[in-house]
């Protein structure tokens, strides 16, 4: 990404490790002041920015002595000030612009020497030597790599290994990338070099080479006896770069004709540009202990491991490193924590593949991932098991049993899930598992670890009250308690166990089998380039999320048929569409899996049907909102352990595929809407998400003709993270939402463009149909006239479009063929623009305002969490006054932006503010009115978020919406300009007089 800044005129300084970030950031700041040239001080996102390392800290007193105070004062004197007025930013014409730009050259020419000087001064303070281009390796190296960023640390490991085995290799780590100094570069290159490989972490399609490669090649251009120079790409999209990949790069240079413009880390079996993979070689320093932890997003595993590495680093003299890998799902997604500690500096900027210790915090993972892969012989494995010792043995797959026995693994179990629930911690098993880790490994005395963990608890949870602190104290004690932590006997005969028989579902689509299943097993790195033939533009098929069957819930709802009043509210509020009502005929009920219960459907239109609520246990996230909103006198939904509900999987398949979604009633109220197939299902959103129920209902009402532009944020991540696509198609028609994500800042314009493009093509259809009407038969003319009559009625055009297409297919006139080419535009599209408050109130507000002002028929849904949810809860302009959020730690000082009022000021924009949990019918009215309104509409939906830290948990998110409205924190209203045409007040306040006595209770969570 940083390559995009090359043309800005900023100097650019790279760091390759956490320690280098500490040291070289000072160089950037010091040089920027002295040189008058602005700097981009950069390092690898995630790999370096999110790595935890034990480093030596530069002290401000040391840096203070290096600041050029005269230059600093001159910098301040140049500030715009009315005491010494000047004019900057003038519009310059061609006569002088060029000269002005060239006049700045002297400042850039001076930068390399200044950088080198400050590097020398920092080196004198730290004892760590830095130059604009750092050479590392054999003094007489013949083959060298040139690279920048975190990969240079891995290359150093490989150089030590190769040179110890008789090779002569080296590396130049680029620090000062701009200005690119030939003087300092050549100073770093050994005179013995014969071959150079330049590694770039980018791809510039169509170029003769990538940026750093072209810079290096240019320096040697025209030199006699210049070395052979080749380039390669690596690590794109943060792909892990291992020592074996770097070994392959050095081996490539040993060939008579080294491959140029190659790739590493992937199998390129299409243009065949990848280098052959080399065998893995362990290069971490001897004595380095490696531990790997598999967890679930929001279960606290990552946070606990951050504490663990800090405890080890603080309590010992050991070097420490921690790195955390995530999938793209929200809470409930896959996480892997990689911890290293030892007596030597750790330069391994890649994931752990041969751990000494593995902990699996999620029982379901033993059937989903190869959690034991690479675990060292004699290592330890800790499983958070919901079963006792004997039941655990029954549930373990044979390949795991065999690995445990063959490699003499020390196997431990603890029921962290049960302990956590008993202590009141819910699904947060992190502290329990952290304590068990220290007890098993004894990397520091357990008593010291307990003391440090409790100190960390005081620091983390002290503000949340004594009760929370004590619960976590108890979790620490429980994790190492005898009787809780059990060492499992591993029978020797497990060595001879065959693999379990794997049942292959031949009905699974090829894309699912070949790509989705592989990625979901955390084996996406193994997919070759050829796997994406046909998907080169990044397009993914719709509806892949239903094949995941993650099974991440601890408890799922069980339907109590006798208590159900058939309101369908449970399905209405479900964030993941994992619970649905079905209508069955007597024959369908008779053919259902044995034991399927149902009851006569209530309602005149439903006479003769049997009613059933069906749960998909493996798709449910166990939030419990369905059970919470159930209004039955005795709850019709009771949360039960997932394992007890697995019998419902077959019933789900039968109800979903065989019984289907009967169009017996119009979806004109809350109950009836839920008999419609959701076309947004099983997303990667957090359990209890407040956003997704809003989107799900829109998909049920308008999904067959929906076009969606989605702003970057939570809704784009759970809406379209490869390989999971929750937007799906209607089983009968094959239609469904067409979804795309552009950027954060341009989503409103993007959606506006989608709508305009579709409308232009549809207008063309209408014009062609009208112009050629008389060339068609009477039946076709009737079909066309019916279509024209319903032109602006979206739902009616579904039927009239099919009828017109069928009639045109029988015609021979050339115009019929031309019209049929455009048949995908017969139906009136329902254009939706989705995004969060960070987009609508802040970064994309200009676009939102522009689109609303246009008067065009588009619908904007803002899922308002009042913070930037996707990035961890930072304050936005939607955050209300007094609220505590990131960047507003002492409470936001200004009031919330009234987006609805601003939109209403136009007078021709439909605006609604809604909260489903407070008034389900009001939300439904609002979206139906908004979609039917022949102009722009804006719906602002209150959405509780995991970042709010609700004390009652996200299982009460619908209740939280209700509280927000009842106490006056959030208002419900609709502003419909169509009413003004009828002489009525367009504004309707839908919420009651607030009960302000409930306001404090709401704020307290």
Named regions from a protein language model:
Residues 1-45, 69, 218, 222-235, ...:
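Conserved thiamine diphosphate
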Residues 1-6, 10-34, 116-267, 273-377, 569, ...:
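Thiamine diphosphate
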Residues 12-74, 238-278, 471-493, 908-962:
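Structural signature of the thiamine diphosphate
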Residues 39-134, 495, 960-976:
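Conformationally flexible catalytic loops at phosphate/diphosphate-handling active centers
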Residues 119-143, 156, 274-288, 545-547, ...:
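Glycine-/acidic-rich phosphate or pyrophosphate-binding loops and their flanking alpha/beta elements
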Residues 179-180, 184, 192-195, 199-210, ...:
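Active-site cofactor/cluster-binding pocket
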Residues 449, 453, 462-619, 627-831, ...:
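Ferredoxin-type iron-sulfur electron-transfer modules and their immediate structural context
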């Amino acid at each position: 990404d940083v390559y995009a800044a090359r043309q800005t005129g900023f100097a650019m300084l790279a760091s390759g490790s956490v320690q280098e970030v500490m040291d070289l950031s000072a160089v950037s700041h010091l040089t920027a002041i002295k040189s008058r040239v602005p700097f981009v001080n950069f390092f690898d996102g995630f790999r370096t920015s999110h790595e935890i390392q034990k480093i030596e800290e530069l002290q401000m007193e040391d840096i203070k002595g290096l600041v050029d105070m005269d230059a600093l004062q001159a910098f301040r004197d140049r500030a715009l000030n009315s005491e010494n007025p000047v004019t900057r930013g003038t519009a310059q014409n061609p006569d002088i612009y060029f000269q002005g730009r060239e006049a700045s050259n002297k400042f850039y020419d001076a930068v390399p020497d200044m950088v080198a000087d400050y590097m020398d001064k920092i080196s004198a303070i730290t004892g760590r030597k830095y130059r604009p281009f750092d050479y590392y390796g054999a003094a007489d190296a013949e083959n060298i790599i040139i690279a920048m960023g975190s990969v240079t640390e891995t290359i150093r490991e490989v150089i030590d290994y190769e040179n110890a085995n008789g090779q002569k290799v080296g590396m130049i780590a680029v620090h000062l990338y701009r200005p690119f100094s030939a003087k300092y570069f050549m100073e770093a290159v050994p005179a013995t070099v014969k071959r150079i490989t330049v590694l770039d972490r980018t791809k510039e399609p169509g170029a003769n080479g990538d940026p750093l490669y072209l810079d290096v090649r240019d320096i040697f251009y025209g030199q006699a006896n210049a070395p052979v120079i080749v380039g390669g790409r690596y690590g794109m999209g943060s792909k892990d770069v291992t020592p074996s990949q770097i070994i392959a790069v050095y081996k490539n240079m040993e060939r008579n004709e080294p491959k140029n413009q190659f790739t590493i880390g992937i199998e390129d079996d299409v243009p065949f540009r990848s280098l052959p993979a080399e065998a893995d070689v362990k290069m971490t320093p001897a004595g380095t202990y490696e531990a790997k932890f598999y967890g679930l997003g929001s279960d606290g595993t990552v946070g606990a491991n951050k504490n663990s590495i800090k405890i080890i680093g603080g309590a010992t003299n050991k070097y420490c490193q921690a790195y955390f890998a995530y999938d793209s799902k929200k809470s409930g997604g896959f996480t892997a924590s990689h911890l290293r500690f030892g007596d030597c500096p750790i330069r391994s900027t890649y994931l752990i593949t041969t751990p000494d210790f593995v902990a699996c915090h999620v029982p379901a993972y033993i059937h989903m991932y190869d959690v034991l892969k690479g675990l060292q012989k004699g290592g330890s494995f800790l499983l958070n098991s919901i079963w006792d010792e004997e039941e655990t043995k029954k549930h373990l797959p044979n390949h795991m049993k065999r690995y445990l026995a063959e490699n003499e693994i020390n196997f431990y179990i603890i029921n962290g899930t049960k302990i956590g629930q008993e202590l009141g911690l819910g699904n947060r098993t992190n502290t329990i598992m952290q304590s068990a880790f220290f007890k098993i490994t004894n990397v520091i005395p357990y008593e010291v670890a307990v003391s440090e963990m409790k100190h960390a608890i005081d620091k983390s949870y002290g503000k949340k009250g004594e009760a929370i602190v004590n619960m976590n104290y108890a979790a620490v004690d429980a994790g190492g308690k005898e009787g809780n932590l059990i060492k499992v006997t591993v029978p020797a005969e497990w060595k001879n166990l065959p693999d379990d028989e794997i049942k292959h579902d031949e009905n699974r689509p090829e894309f699912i089998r070949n790509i989705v299943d592989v990625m979901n097993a955390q084996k996406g790195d193994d997919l070759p380039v050829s796997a994406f033939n046909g998907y080169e533009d990044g397009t993914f098929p719709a509806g892949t999320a239903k094949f995941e069957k993650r099974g991440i819930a601890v408890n799922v709802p069980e339907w109590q048929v006798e208590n159900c009043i058939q309101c369908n509210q449970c399905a209405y509020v479900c964030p993941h569409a994992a619970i649905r009502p079905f209508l069955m005929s007597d024959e369908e009920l008779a053919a259902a899996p044995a034991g399927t219960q149902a009851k006569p459907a209530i309602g005149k239109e439903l006479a003769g049907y049997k009613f059933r609520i069906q749960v998909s246990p493996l798709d449910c996230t166990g939030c419990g909102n369905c059970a919470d909103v159930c209004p039955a006198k005795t709850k019709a939904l009771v949360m039960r352990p997932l394992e007890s509900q697995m019998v419902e999987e077959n019933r789900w398949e039968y109800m979903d595929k065989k019984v289907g979604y009967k169009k017996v009633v119009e979806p004109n109220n809350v109950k009836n809407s839920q008999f419609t197939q959701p076309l947004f299902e099983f997303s990667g959103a957090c359990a209890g998400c407040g956003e997704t129920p809003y989107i799900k209902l829109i998909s049920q009402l308008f999904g067959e003709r929906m076009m969606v532009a989605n702003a970057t944020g939570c809704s784009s991540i759970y809406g379209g993270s490869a390989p999971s696509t929750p937007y799906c198609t209607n089983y009968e028609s094959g239609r469904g939402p067409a979804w795309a994500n552009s950027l954060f800042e341009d989503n409103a314009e993007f959606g506006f463009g989608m709508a305009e493009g579709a409308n232009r093509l549809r207008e063309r259809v209408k014009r062609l149909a009208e112009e050629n009407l008389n060339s068609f038969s009477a039946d076709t003319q009737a079909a066309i006239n019916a279509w024209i009559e319903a032109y602006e009625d979206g739902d009616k055009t579904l039927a009239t479009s099919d009828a017109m297409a069928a009639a045109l297919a029988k015609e021979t006139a050339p115009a019929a063929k031309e019209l049929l080419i455009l048949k995908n535009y017969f139906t009136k599209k329902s254009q939706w623009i989705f995004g969060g408050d960070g987009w609508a109130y802040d970064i994309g507000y200009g676009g939102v305002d522009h689109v609303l002002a246009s008067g065009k028929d588009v619908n904007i849904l803002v899922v308002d969490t009042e913070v930037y949810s996707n990035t961890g809860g930072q304050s936005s302009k939607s955050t209300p006054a007094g609220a505590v959020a990131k960047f507003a730690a002492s409470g936001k000082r200004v009031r919330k932006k009234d987006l609805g009022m601003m939109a209403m000021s136009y007078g021709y924009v439909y605006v609604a503010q809604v909260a489903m949990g407070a008034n389900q019918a009001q939300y439904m009215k609002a979206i139906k009115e908004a979609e039917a309104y022949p102009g722009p509409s804006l719906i602002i939906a209150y959405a509780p978020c995991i970042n709010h830290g609700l004390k009652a948990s996200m299982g009460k998110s619908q209740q939280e919406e209700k509280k927000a409205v009842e106490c006056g924190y959030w208002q419900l209203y609709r502003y419909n300009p169509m009413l003004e045409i009828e002489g009525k007040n367009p504004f309707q306040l839908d919420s009651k007089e607030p009960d302000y006595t409930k306001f404090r209770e709401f704020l307290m969570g």
